[in-house]
């Protein structure tokens, strides 16, 4: 929000210096990004009237002028501007003046003719371009001899504020003045709104077909206007110092009212409209050529203003070229509306352009301001362009309901740490336009129509704090009781997981939750992902249901930077659709390993990491849980090198090698290994229980079984563990053999069996029956003891 201090003072009767106001606004939460004078520093420039002009005797492009600069006698100045002529009033720098760049004016000769100064253009004074090739021509009533800085108020300060999205009420002079009044106690002088005399007969019918999107729409026809009328200099100056270029009187008036009171407006050429105005959603196939000369194809989630023939404007964003006013316009329709922020939000990104109107509408405009805006704009149109105003036509849809918020003085003291008297609290609320009602514990406030951000008690506490002044709150130590939350033995601390991954050589990464829809198809086989209504970009159109896509992208970035060994992990949320189309978000940990199993060294041959390397990392991560790995198929993973991670019969994640078909698509020289696990399962751990250590020696038996290639080691171990009794402490595979001596399609798998008793030394008589049951179980499962 950019504005001049002089304009602000018309509504806030403050005598603060510009520096003090800058500090006050910033400390109250309205950050001042920039504060500078309306024009760069220069001295010695006055208003002069050109009395006569003669051609230079020795230069075709120069003129010799006699000017009255208020010195009591005419001053001769040589001038080369093409628009110099007798009778005009212009800025004049006399000898001793200092212009931009420390350019000093002194008496000089130009082609033999004495020149006692210089007549100036806007460029030479650092003023906004007036579109004139030559001297800056001033109004005829400009007083000769007056300092130009004083006449044009060039020492005025122009403020640029960084308004946060919740403070749309401060996107106008009226809103800023209200704030200054609350902060300083100065008088708040609201712009006077006068009902226009009704002299015209035409009305513009209005119909709201989307009442949830448009709460109010007001139109007024003004007939017989002079569209060629010049915008007054005072209005031009205020617009220019607010960063808005003057276009034409009718357009300037709409912009002026928006800046003055905060209501965006639009002006239609009434003779280019057909029938009633309809506020509705766009229809399939509709297009619009906008005022910026861009033609856009409209989506059905876009609100438009249309007549009987078609779309006239993008509601709250930009008008259409076909219904725009021009120098030939004779009759106009003024529009002031309230559009729901939700329907305007994101449209600037969607269509690739925005406007001052959309900037305000998507943040929220006062829904009681529209009639005042029409009356104010009408007053200015009649004053500048003439015409006859007709009656206002108003249509109403669904408007927001005013919210009531309770403020407890005790809570205010607890949060701010300072005891502010109730009467002072009441005064602050009144100055902010929040009419307070006394209650037993404090005040009840009904949020005004211009404050969408007042919803809960904390909002009121913030308002009191910033107006009271954060600098006025004493630097006392706050005290309070902190209760430590007990961490049960069955839960690991989160930092332990991060430390565990770092200890295994993984680096933490963070990726976007918004991902490319193709990733969801490739890595999760998700044909119906959660789509964003207003994505930041096409490649961030959906919410992720897996972390794999982000990890693969990070791998690509590292490979592009010549990193040939990458191990990364991420702990983040993934999103999916639950029952009744509700969204579910779960936290997961994902990891990726690419490249060599070990860093290059002399003591170990280089080999690429494989499934068992990353499986070992997963086992280490889940060492406090009993888990098993079950062969599976997953859209992201190699068909023969993928496993589900199962705990207590529930699948808690997966691990494996990336599918070969994705290597070429994602430009990967070799396959990375990945895993993804529910974070809740990772944080769980089984309670540690005491287990006595046997003082008797263990007994080991090695068994080799011949089995079909289709039989997995999990099948064998499941059969053996099912037949084991309490003497069996461990069963594990230690060798697999294929080749000579075995029938085709068969393999040999050797297992070790560790037996131990807590009370006795084991004998063959005790061990052999146990081993026999294990052999029988393996035989029943399809494996034969190898002889």
Positions of PLM-derived features:
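Extended, well-folded interaction surfaces typified by the phenylalanyl-tRNA synthetase beta subunit core
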Residues: 175, 405-565, 569, 701, ...
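Terminal amphipathic helices with adjacent charged low-complexity linkers/tails
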Residues: 180, 184-209, 385-412, 418-419
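Conserved mixed alpha/beta core segments that line enzyme active sites in large multi-domain catalysts
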Residues: 47-76, 236-237, 254-322
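A carboxyl-terminal module marker
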Residues: 2, 431-434, 582-584, 598-787
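Mobile "lid/hinge" segments at catalytic clefts and subdomain interfaces of large enzymes
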Residues: 111-126, 130-137, 148-153, 157, ...
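Glycine/proline-enriched, intrinsically flexible loops and inter-domain linkers
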Residues: 4-5, 23, 63, 184, ...
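Beta-rich nucleic-acid/ligand-interaction surfaces
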Residues: 39-43, 195-198, 482-483, 487, ...
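Phosphate-backbone binding interfaces of nucleic-acid-interacting proteins
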Residues: 1-200, 333, 352, 356, ...
């Amino acid at each position: 929000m950019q504005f001049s201090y002089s304009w602000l003072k018309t509504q806030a009767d403050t005598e603060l210096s510009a520096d003090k106001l800058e500090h006050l606004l910033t400390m109250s939460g309205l950050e001042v990004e920039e504060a500078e004078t309306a024009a760069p520093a220069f001295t010695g420039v006055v208003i002069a009237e050109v009395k006569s002009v003669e051609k230079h005797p020795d230069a075709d492009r120069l003129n010799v002028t006699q000017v009255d600069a208020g010195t009591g006698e005419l001053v001769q100045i040589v001038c080369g501007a093409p628009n110099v002529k007798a009778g005009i009033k212009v800025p004049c720098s006399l000898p001793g003046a200092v212009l931009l760049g420390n350019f000093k004016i002194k008496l000089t000769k130009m082609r033999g003719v004495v020149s006692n100064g210089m007549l100036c253009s806007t460029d030479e004074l650092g003023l906004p371009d007036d579109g004139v090739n030559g001297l800056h021509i001033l109004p005829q009533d400009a007083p000769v001899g007056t300092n130009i800085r004083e006449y044009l108020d060039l020492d005025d300060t122009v403020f640029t504020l960084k308004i946060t999205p919740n403070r749309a009420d401060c996107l106008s002079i009226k809103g800023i003045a209200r704030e200054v009044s609350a902060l300083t106690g100065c008088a708040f002088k609201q712009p006077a709104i006068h009902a226009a005399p009704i002299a015209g007969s035409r009305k513009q019918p209005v119909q709201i077909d989307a009442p949830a999107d448009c709460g109010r729409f007001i139109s007024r026809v003004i007939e017989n206007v002079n569209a060629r009328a010049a915008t007054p200099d005072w209005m031009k100056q205020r617009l220019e110092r607010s960063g808005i270029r003057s276009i034409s009187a009718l357009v300037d008036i709409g912009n002026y009212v928006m800046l003055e009171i905060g209501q965006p407006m639009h002006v239609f050429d009434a003779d280019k409209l057909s029938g009633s105005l309809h506020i509705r959603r766009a229809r399939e196939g509709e297009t619009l050529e906008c005022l910026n000369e861009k033609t856009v194809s409209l989506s059905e989630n876009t609100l438009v203003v249309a007549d009987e023939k078609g779309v006239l404007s993008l509601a709250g964003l930009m008008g259409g070229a076909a219904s725009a006013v021009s120098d030939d316009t004779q009759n106009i329709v003024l529009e002031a509306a309230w559009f729901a922020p939700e329907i305007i939000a994101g449209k600037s990104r969607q269509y690739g352009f925005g406007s001052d109107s959309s900037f305000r509408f998507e943040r929220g405009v006062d829904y009681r301001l529209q009639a005042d805006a029409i009356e104010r704009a009408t007053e200015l149109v009649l004053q500048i362009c003439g015409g006859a105003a007709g009656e206002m036509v108003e249509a109403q849809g669904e408007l927001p309901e005013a919210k009531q918020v309770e403020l407890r003085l005790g809570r205010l003291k607890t949060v701010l740490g300072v005891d502010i008297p109730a009467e002072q609290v009441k005064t602050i609320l009144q100055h902010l336009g929040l009419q307070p009602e006394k209650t037993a514990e404090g005040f009840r406030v009904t949020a005004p129509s211009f404050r969408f951000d007042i919803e809960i008690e904390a909002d009121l506490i913030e308002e009191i704090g910033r107006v009271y002044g954060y600098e006025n709150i004493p630097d006392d130590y706050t005290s309070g009781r902190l209760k430590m939350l007990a961490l049960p033995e069955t839960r690991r601390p989160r930092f332990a997981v991060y430390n565990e991954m770092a200890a295994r050589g993984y680096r933490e990464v963070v990726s976007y939750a918004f991902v490319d829809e193709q990733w969801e198809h490739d890595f999760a086989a998700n044909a119906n992902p959660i789509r964003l209504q207003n994505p930041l970009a096409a490649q961030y159109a959906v919410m992720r249901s897996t972390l794999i896509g982000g990890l693969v992208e990070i791998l690509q970035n590292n490979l592009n930077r010549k990193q040939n060994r990458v191990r990364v992990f991420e702990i983040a949320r993934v999103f999916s659709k639950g029952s009744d189309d509700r969204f579910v978000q779960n936290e997961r940990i994902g990891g990726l390993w690419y490249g060599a199993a070990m860093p290059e060294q002399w003591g170990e041959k280089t080999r690429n990491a494989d499934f068992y390397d990353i499986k070992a990392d997963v086992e280490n991560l889940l060492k406090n849980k009993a888990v098993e790995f079950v062969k599976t198929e997953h859209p992201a993973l190699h068909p023969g090198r993928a496993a589900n991670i199962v705990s207590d019969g529930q699948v808690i994640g997966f691990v494996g090698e990336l599918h070969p078909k994705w290597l070429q698509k994602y430009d990967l020289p070799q396959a990375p290994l990945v895993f993804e696990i529910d974070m809740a399962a990772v944080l769980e751990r089984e309670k540690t229980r005491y287990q006595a250590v046997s003082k008797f020696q263990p007994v080991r038996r090695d068994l080799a079984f011949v089995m079909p290639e289709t039989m997995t080691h999990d099948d064998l171990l499941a059969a053996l563990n099912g037949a084991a009794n309490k003497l069996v402490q461990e069963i594990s595979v230690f060798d697999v053999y294929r080749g000579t001596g075995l029938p085709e399609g068969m393999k040999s798998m050797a297992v070790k069996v560790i037996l131990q008793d807590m009370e006795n030394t084991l004998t063959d008589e005790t061990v052999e029956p146990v081993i026999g049951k294990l052999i029988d179980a393996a035989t029943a499962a399809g494996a034969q003891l190898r002889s």
